[in-house]
Amino acid sequence: MAAGTSNYWEDLRKQARQLENELDLKLVSFSKLCTSYSHSSARDGGRDRYSSDTTPLLNGSSQDRMFETMAIEIEQLLARLTGVNDKMAEYTHSAGVPSLNAALMHTLQRHRDILQDYTHEFHKTKANFMAIRERENLMGSVRKDIESYKSGSGVNNRRTELFLKEHDHLRNSDRLIEETISIAMATKENMTSQRGMLKSIHSKMNTLANRFPAVNSLIQRINLRKRRDSLILGGVIGICTILLLLYAFH
């Protein structure tokens, strides 16, 4: 019976690790999609990406479809990983083995932390993508209104020129903001990679500590002996100092 429950726990851990690996790859691709969308809108800043007839619209709709598809896939993976974590939580409560319960809870907490990080990263990247797309739609609408006004009136007066200059200035500022967002997202990907590496190192250290408890016990005894020797040495030095002072003032 114990072997069966142990195999069930290991199977859940295997499923969790597999889903976490899939989510990691999906989130990296999702972040790159958002970055490429930002770069494409920045490259089109010098010309109206909404005034052309077919190609930009097709590219935009293709990216939108890809975004929706990847978002659905990531949400499904997050839901599956949540289900596996819930099963692991049920197992820890019904294991009935106090000596193993702490180790199981520690493993479960690590998987929960990873799920929380992936969920936060997904929602943040999705929000950035939606903000960029809404901003592009707004700027394209303004540009179309300006072009419609120019073609309808046929008068290139001073007010229109000032309005266009202000619009171009806003687009340049928007391009700088998008470049800053891209740099921040690249930095975030690097930090995420380093965080995963540190978690892996921490997990290996915990595994070694749990596998070799005698090493921890030996280190604690050595530290205790050092502390005791320091106290004895300090006491001897204090007594000698007092005796010397008494002798000097005698």
UniProtKB/Swiss-Prot annotation:
Biased composition (Basic and acidic residues): 41-51
Key words, A-Z: Acetylation, Coiled coil, ER-Golgi transport, Golgi apparatus, Membrane, Phosphoprotein, Protein transport, Transmembrane, Transmembrane helix, Transport
Transmembrane region(s): 230-250
Cytoplasmic topological domain residue ranges: 2-229
InterPro entries, sorted: Golgi_SNAP_su1
Parts forming coiled coils: 9-30, 68-95
Gene Ontology cellular component terms for the protein in this record: cis-Golgi network; cytosol; Golgi apparatus; Golgi medial cisterna; Golgi membrane; membrane; SNARE complex
Pfam families found in the cross-reference section: V-SNARE_C
UniProt modified residues of type N-acetylalanine: 2
Single GO term (MF): SNAP receptor activity
Entry membrane topology: Single-pass type IV membrane protein
Domain of life: Eukaryota
UniProt record similarity statement: Belongs to the GOSR1 family.
PANTHER family associated with the record: GOLGI SNAP RECEPTOR COMPLEX MEMBER 1 (PTHR21094:SF2), GOS-28 SNARE- RELATED (PTHR21094)
Known role: Involved in transport from the ER to the Golgi apparatus as well as in intra-Golgi transport. It belongs to a super-family of proteins called t-SNAREs or soluble NSF (N-ethylmaleimide-sensitive factor) attachment protein receptor. May play a protective role against hydrogen peroxide induced cytotoxicity under glutathione depleted conditions in neuronal cells by regulating the intracellular ROS levels via inhibition of p38 MAPK (MAPK11, MAPK12, MAPK13 and MAPK14). Participates in docking and fusion stage of ER to cis-Golgi transport.
Subunit structure: Component of several multiprotein Golgi SNARE complexes. Identified in a SNARE complex with BET1, STX5 and YKT6, in a SNARE complex with BET1L, STX5 and YKT6, in a SNARE complex with STX5, GOSR2, SEC22B and BET1, and in complex with STX5 and COG3. Interacts with GABARAPL2. Interacts with the 34 kDa STX5 isoform.
Protein's recorded name: Golgi SNAP receptor complex member 1
Record organism: Rattus norvegicus
Designated gene of the protein: Gosr1
